[in-house]
């Protein structure tokens, strides 16, 4: 009942029996319980709407065939044959969901569901969302994870060289990689490409796929913004069979075709006397070629380039990490084009 000492101006005769202050304690508790139940009902209705827009499954077993892409993450050739890749981490998965890439499924701890719900709801396709504890997911994939957020995306169909040339306004800027097999370095190079406005990445037949999990992770999801041409690989041949565009058989032939279209092909080579970086001209259409840190650019690819250019360094340093070298070359290109 009312506490006259606390509420001196309260008049029970005027307020009526519906005043919370005048209600008996048990009736007040009952009203609070009803409110809690009503809020829970509204939450359940909202959750049901989410489930209708994308499928949610709580998983507790590794046996589901839909989870195989996550269980086989250490077998990348299987993913390449299926034309899929795995995105790992909150930022990378978010960028995948924001991209035009098709998404098959998402796996995450339940605490992340509300974070990703708007992005998943906005997708044109229905996505299956698997919920599980992070420790369970680590057992599924076979390694420790910081956030436990993963997604399976679909590698897009190959893009032809003619398509890229038609869609890229001048001055064109492409990057090609030869024998770059380290996925982390390839991912870092992709990130630099997007940062400096590269219009396409050409991946040679002896390089790793930029859609390997570690490459995608190190690119921080920027691979979803960069058109990729893969030449002369079995994975490219499989995907090319799904469309009529011919696939080039080698990086050296692709570079010759670029030169025929007026692009200057410039090899980033640490041991050349031809020209140093500040003397090279990047102001017009060009393709910059990078090789592996161990073996550099192959002879056949070097011969297909117009010239080789070096970053000047003291004798004690024979080369830079390919990601660092790409950043230096691409910054110089941006500077010459007035974009730096």
Which positions does each model-derived feature cover?
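Boundary-proximal intrinsically disordered activation/regulatory segments immediately upstream
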Residues: 51-111
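Structured adenosyl-cofactor binding patch, chiefly the S-adenosyl-L-methionine
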Residues: 148, 192-196, 210-223, 299-340
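Intrinsic disorder/low-complexity segments
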Residues: 1-53, 167, 229-253, 260, ...
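Short, aromatic/basic amphipathic alpha-helical patches
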Residues: 114-126, 301
């Amino acid at each position: 009942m009312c506490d006259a000492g606390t509420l001196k101006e309260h008049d029970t005769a005027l307020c009526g029996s519906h005043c919370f202050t005048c209600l008996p304690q048990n009736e007040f508790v009952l009203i609070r319980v009803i409110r809690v139940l009503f809020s829970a009902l509204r939450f359940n209705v909202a959750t049901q709407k989410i489930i209708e827009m994308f499928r949610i499954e709580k998983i507790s077993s590794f046996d589901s065939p839909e989870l195989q892409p996550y269980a086989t993450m250490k077998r990348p050739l299987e993913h390449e044959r299926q034309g899929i890749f795995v995105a790992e981490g909150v930022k990378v998965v978010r960028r995948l969901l924001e991209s035009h890439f098709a998404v098959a499924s998402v796996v995450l701890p339940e605490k992340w569901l509300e974070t990703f719900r708007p992005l998943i709801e906005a997708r044109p396709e229905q996505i299956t969302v698997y919920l599980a504890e992070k420790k369970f997911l680590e057992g599924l994939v076979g390694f420790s994870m910081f956030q436990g957020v993963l997604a399976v995306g679909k590698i897009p169909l190959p893009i032809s060289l003619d398509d890229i040339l038609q869609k890229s306004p001048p001055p064109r800027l492409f990057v090609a990689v030869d024998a770059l097999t380290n996925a982390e370095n390839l991912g870092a190079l992709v990130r630099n490409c997007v940062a400096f406005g590269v219009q396409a990445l050409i991946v040679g037949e002896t390089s790793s796929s930029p859609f390997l999990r570690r490459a995608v992770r190190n690119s921080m999801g920027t691979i979803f913004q960069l058109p990729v041409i893969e030449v002369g690989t079995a994975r490219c041949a499989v995907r090319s069979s799904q469309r009529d565009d011919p696939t080039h058989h080698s990086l050296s032939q692709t570079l010759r075709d670029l030169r025929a279209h007026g692009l200057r092909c410039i090899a980033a080579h640490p041991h050349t006397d031809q020209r140093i970086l500040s003397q090279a001209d990047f102001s017009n259409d060009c393709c910059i070629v990078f090789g592996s840190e161990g073996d550099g650019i192959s002879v056949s690819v070097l011969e297909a380039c117009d010239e080789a250019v070096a970053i000047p360094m003291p004798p004690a340093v024979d080369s830079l990490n390919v990601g660092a070298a790409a950043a230096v070359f691409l910054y110089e290109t941006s500077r010459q084009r007035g974009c730096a």
